[in-house]
Design a protein with these regions (language model features):
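Conserved PLP-enzyme active-site core in the AAT-like
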Residues: 1-202
Length: 203
């Protein structure tokens, strides 16, 4: 999951960029600086919010403060949303869209840390499309490990133009395994006949 998030952010953010996320986001609290490392130095800029969720109003205020100092400060880079959050709360598709609307008003791409994405879908009662690209998400870290798979995550990139850069960064970062088919086989079974959703409903 850490690699999925960090490599995803690396294709969205320059080394001098800012990644806006909640102060209790997994990329801030539990990834040992991996996003900063894989992006080449991008800064995580923290956003407050009750129950580990950002609000559009607070996100807008924080984004507005960053990147206005010219060469002396980090530039606006991307927004990362954790869904479900580290506190177990869930953004609805409408709430994701509201955050993405703020992001797009500053021309910022949106990343979703979906380590518990399936749990969020089940709780919100929406489709994967409604929670992601239809709501303005550009890249999804799609978790399998926290829902029954063994060491398997996927990254879903909705802009095909970004996919090749991700492939190169994955290889360079040591995450292209020679026996990757054994991981892919898990994901294939996971997504067949709704197994992933049944597991999430039981969790």
């Amino acid at each position: 999951g850490t690699a999925a998030n960090a490599l995803s952010l690396a294709i969205l953010t320059d080394p001098w960029g800012a990644v806006f996320c909640h102060r209790h986001a997994h990329i801030e609290e539990d990834e040992c600086g991996a996003p900063e490392f894989y992006t080449g130095g991008a800064k995580l800029v923290l956003v407050d919010g009750a129950h580990a969720k950002m609000s559009p109003e607070t996100l807008r205020k924080v984004i507005a403060r960053v990147g206005s100092g010219g060469v002396h400060g980090v530039q606006r880079g991307a927004v990362s949303i954790t869904n479900a959050t580290e506190n177990g709360t869930v953004y609805s598709a409408q709430q994701v869209w509201a955050l993405a609307e703020v992001s797009k008003s500053y021309n910022l791409p949106v990343h979703m840390d979906g380590a518990r994405f399936t749990n969020a879908l089940v709780r919100a009662g929406c489709t994967p499309a409604e929670m992601t690209w239809k709501a303005g998400v550009d890249v999804l870290s799609f978790g399998g490990t926290k829902n029954g798979c063994m060491g398997v995550e996927a990254v879903v990139i909705f802009d095909p133009a970004k996919a090749w850069e991700f492939e190169l960064r994955r290889k360079r970062g040591g995450h292209l395994f020679s026996k990757h088919r054994y991981l892919s086989a898990q994901m294939d079974a996971y997504l067949t006949d709704g197994l992933w959703l049944r597991l999430a409903r039981a969790a």
